[in-house]
Amino acid sequence: MPNTFGHLFRITTWGESHGKGVGVVIDGCPPRIPLSEEDIQKELDRRRPGQSKITTQRKERDIAAILSGTFNGMTLGTPIMIWVKNEDARPEAYAEMEKIYRPSHADFTYQAKYGIRNWQGGGRSSARETIGRVAGGAVGGKVLQFLYPEIEVIAWVSEVHGLKSLCDPNTVTREDVESNILRWPNAENLGEALKEIERAQKEGDTVGGIVECIVRGMPVGLGEPVFDKLEADLAKAMLSLPASKGFEIGSGFRGALMRGSEHNDPFYMEGNKVRTKTNWSGGVQGGISNGENLYFRVAFKPVATIAQEQQTVSVDGEEVILRARGRHDPCVLPRAVPIVEAMTKLVLVDHALRQKAIELTPRSFS
C-alpha cells in the first residue's frame, strides 16, 4: 500500500482515524531551515475538526509534536517525524460497520483488495490521514519560502452545490478567504452558501463543491517534461485527497469548447521578462511553469456519510438498511482549503529542489 508522495522532498503519512495517533515522516528536507512546532500548528489549526457548525463536531486539538529531525529550531537534513495524538477517538461508535459496507466509502474495496480492513472510521481511508499532509506541507512551505520567497499559495471555496462565489482569482487575498467559517471570499452571497449547507445538514444530508487555488510569484522552469509535468503532479496530488473527484487547470474542460485562436496565450515583453496576455494555460506550458499565475480547481463530492437510511450489503452478502452514525462534516470544503494548499506546496517544493539541481549544471561546458 503506497503511503509516500514526492521525489526529492518526500512525505510518508501514517496512522488511522481511531488509532492512537496520526502523523508524517518527511525525508529530503534540506538542513538549516528554521522550523518550530508553531509553524506546523498554525496550519493544522486551519484544518482541525470542530471549527464551526458546518464542520464535524469531533473535538480534536491536533497538537503537533516534532519527534526528530530538528535541533535548536533548525532542520538537520535528517528525517523529520511529526506526531498528532488522537484525543477524541470513539471506535465503539463504528461497531455496526464491522459487518456492513458503508455506501461510497472504501469499506468494500479495501476488504476485497486486502482481505482485511479497519472498520473504525475507515482507518487509512479517513480524511484524518490528511493531518500528515498538512504537517508535511507546512514544512515544505518553509523550504519553498527559502528557495522562492515571492511564491504565495492561496486556496478558497469557490462553489457550494452549484452556487458560485464569483470572486476574481487574481485579486483574492488570504484575508478575504479567512474572514468567515466557509473560507468563501465573497461576502455578498456568503449567507446563501451557508444556508445551502445548513439545509442539507438539517435533512441529514451533505453537499459538495469546488476549491480553487492560485499560486502567485511563480518562477519559470518548475516541472519536468513528459511524465512529471507540473500539472500532472498537481493532478495526482489533488486526486489523492479524500472525496476529490475532479481536477482542471487553466481553461480546463472549457478549453475543449474553444478554438486555438481563442485559447492561445500571446507572448509580449514586460521589460526583460516574457509574459502572456492571457492565462488559459493556467501558468503551465509543456508541463513547465511559465512564470504566470498557477491556477487550478478541485472538485469534491458530498461527504459519503449521511444521516439517512441507505441500502447496502453486509460482509455476508445480505442486503440491509444502514443509517450511518459518527461525527462527520456536512460539507468538507472549508477544511479542504488548507489541505489543497498543503499538497500544492509539496508538489512545488519537490519541483523547486529538482530545478535547483538542474541550475547547478553549467549552460555551457566550453
UniProtKB/Swiss-Prot annotation:
State the superkingdom: Bacteria
Name of one Pfam family that matches: Chorismate_synt
Keyword Amino-acid biosynthesis found = yes
Which Enzyme Commission number(s) are listed?
4.2.3.5
Task: Spell out the InterPro entries in the cross-references.
Answer: Chorismate_synth, Chorismate_synth_AroC_sf, Chorismate_synthase_CS
**Binding positions (NADP(+)):** 47
First-level EC class: lyase
- Phylogenetic classification of the source organism: Bacteria, Pseudomonadati, Verrucomicrobiota, Methylacidiphilae, Methylacidiphilales
Q: Where is the signal peptide?
A: none
User: Which ranges form a coiled coil?
Assistant: none
Which NCBIfam families does the record match to this protein?
aroC, PRK05382.1
Entry keyword set: Amino-acid biosynthesis, Aromatic amino acid biosynthesis, FAD, Flavoprotein, FMN, Lyase, NADP
Q: Name one GO biological process term.
A: aromatic amino acid family biosynthetic process
The catalytic activity, as recorded, is: 5-O-(1-carboxyvinyl)-3-phosphoshikimate = chorismate + phosphate
Assembly information from the UniProt record: Homotetramer.
Under the GO molecular function aspect, what terms does this record hold? Answer: chorismate synthase activity; FMN binding
Binding, FMN: 124-126, 286, 301-305, 327
UniProt organism field? Methylacidiphilum infernorum (isolate V4)
Q: What does this protein do?
A: This reaction introduces a second double bond into the aromatic ring system.
Q: Which cofactor does it need?
A: FMNH2
PANTHER family, from UniProt? CHORISMATE SYNTHASE
Know the name of this protein?
Chorismate synthase
Similarity section: Belongs to the chorismate synthase family.
Where does this protein act, in terms of pathway?
Answer: Metabolic intermediate biosynthesis; chorismate biosynthesis; chorismate from D-erythrose 4-phosphate and phosphoenolpyruvate: step 7/7
Query: Per the annotation, how and in what number is the cofactor bound?
Result: Reduced FMN (FMNH(2)).
Does the UniProt entry include the keyword Cell inner membrane? no
- Cite the CDD domains for this sequence: Chorismate_synthase
